[in-house]
Amino acid sequence: MKNRAYIVHFAGIFAMILWGMSFVWSTQAYQNLNPTTTIFLRLVVATVFFTAILFLFHLNEKIHRKDLKLFALAAMFEPFLYFIFEGYGLKNTSPVIGSGLIAMIPLVTPIAARIFLKERLTPMNILGFIVSFVGVIVMLINKNLEFTASPKGILFLCGAVLVAVG
């Protein structure tokens, strides 16, 4: 049982490394390919991979017809619109700024839950958002307090954050 814990921790660390590197890889890919093309290829590869896993391990789940609209809506937001916004955001900014803004998703989520679901915000939620927001501002301005990032790229990345939260 102890070995299983190590496998889970290793898998988590490996996933974080891949996630962090994906910003750099995406930026490199966008130098040669349009973000839409890259996203299409990424989703095709993921579809083939996960479909193979479904059949290989017999993980087929029957989806009720009434749930198809909700699945389609969810797929439209995540991954489709999220990747579109993130892709064009990374094409217009640096991977550092992109990863910093995308890292705000877990901090914006409680705020959206407060607005739409009337959930309570904890002091840690508020503190986390403030610290993260200040960190993003520090990344976006230079020592002369001038805005250095592309506003277009920032807007696309903010769109990715909002779509991921929605």
Show where each model-derived region lies.
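Transmembrane alpha-helices of multi-pass small-molecule transport proteins
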Residues: 8, 32-81, 108-109, 162-166
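C-terminal transmembrane-helix exit sites in multi-pass transporters
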Residues: 49-61, 105-130
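Glycine-/small-residue-enriched transmembrane alpha-helix faces in small-molecule transporters
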Residues: 1-37, 147-166
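Hydrophobic side-chain positions within alpha-helical transmembrane segments
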Residues: 25, 85, 108-112
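Structural signature of hydrophobic alpha-helical transmembrane segments
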Residues: 34-46, 87-105, 150-162
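Specific transmembrane alpha-helical segments of multi-pass solute transporters/efflux pumps
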Residues: 18, 22-23, 51-98, 102, ...
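Hydrophobic transmembrane alpha-helices of multi-pass small-molecule transport proteins
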Residues: 50, 72, 121-142, 160-161
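Hydrophobic/aromatic residues within transmembrane alpha-helices
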Residues: 29, 38, 42, 89, ...
